[in-house]
Amino acid sequence: TAQRLQAHGMDAKNTPVTGAVMMDFLRPEFKGYFKDKETLCKEFGLDPAKQLHLYISSFGYASMTDQEVAELSKMAGTDFSGFARTNRVSMEKTLAWFDRYLGDHPEVELVYRRHPSEWKCKALDELAAKRPNFHVIFADSVKQWIVAADSISIWMSTAVAEVYMAGKSCHILRPVPIEHEYDPVIYAGADY
């Protein structure tokens, strides 16, 4: 922060508060910075004529073993076992929804943009093998996918700020409630 830098001797004129610079690329003045839907779809073997639905995931705890959750809980001094259970149940139910939806809607390409903390997941591989219109893609920035997508869904991600800055809206998919202490305040009062 500016105050911290100034407290360490930096001149105030050299510490302007500008906001989140990385969000500037989502401003209208930067239109053209990101690839358009057709270019992005072709790059990843998706049909650009279909609806491009983006799901921004953040099920980082779902891929952790109980032992890993216990170790993390011990290090942090907070019990994450309930939140890990919420992650697992939410992911399982969300993927079941996607399975049914994609079976009924072959006109949709669904890109599952996993969170960097999500590890290899057998359930994702199985759904991708079953549904040719389900794609687990981590390449490119979440901003790139947000800009190109026709529709967006989120479970619980700070990427909701990028969605807003891109001038888009999103659906919040929550098959089960998230514990209050883990739910980002930006979602308070949201309908889902």
How would you label these PLM feature ranges?
Residues 55, 89-137:
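Catalytic donor nucleotide-activated moiety binding site of glycosyltransferases and closely related
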Residues 52, 109, 150-151:
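Structural motif
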